A protein has these predicted regions:
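Intrinsically disordered, low-complexity linkers and tails
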Residues: 1-24, 29-169
């Protein structure tokens, strides 16, 4: 071993390199750039989640809401919708509602009508039209029965913007 390497091992600094920023002298856990990036992301994610929750409240979308995929099969109004295309919201994957993942489908609904294929009873709803003036549609879905209890389902630390963000950092 070279004298330089011996000196690094002796001082405990043995070429420590951050896996986040690739700089030497610290680890990912103590990386200042990562800490700053996480704080910036949390601030943006907090704003996004607040707008998302406001849209859910405005739509009356919550666990137990009845929804239908309007437009997915060419329906023009509620009279055209057959019962097998009506579902009830059963689950919201809160940690998947992320500023950097706007195109995901975190809201799960179960179809209510009889199905030919029992394996396909789930409907996954996309993100709300947060900045849209059209609050009658939710992605390509419409809320048929409005509920006002969504706030009781929100996890305690969800609005801080950090939950679920660890996968990005």
């Amino acid at each position: 071993m070279s004298p330089e390497m011996k000196a690094m091992y002796k001082d405990g600094d043995r070429a420590r390199k951050c896996s986040y920023c690739s700089e030497k002298g610290h680890t990912k856990r103590k990386c200042e750039k990562r800490t700053k990036d996480i704080a910036e992301y949390a601030a943006e994610n907090k704003k996004y989640r607040k707008a998302y929750l406001d849209a859910m409240v405005q739509h009356g979308l919550s666990i137990g809401s009845l929804v239908t995929p309007m437009g997915a099969r060419g329906e023009k109004d509620l009279g055209d919708i057959s019962p097998e295309y009506i579902g009830m919201v059963t689950h919201i994957e809160w940690k998947d509602i992320q500023y950097r993942r706007r195109s995901n489908r975190p809201i799960q609904a179960k179809r209510l009508g009889e199905q030919e294929n029992n394996w396909n009873n789930d409907m996954w709803l996309g993100s709300p039209p947060i900045n849209s003036k059209d609050y009658e549609s939710w992605g390509r879905c419409q809320v048929l029965s409005r509920r006002n209890d969504i706030l009781s389902h929100v996890p305690a630390d969800w609005l801080d913007g950090l939950s679920g963000a660890e996968e990005f950092f």
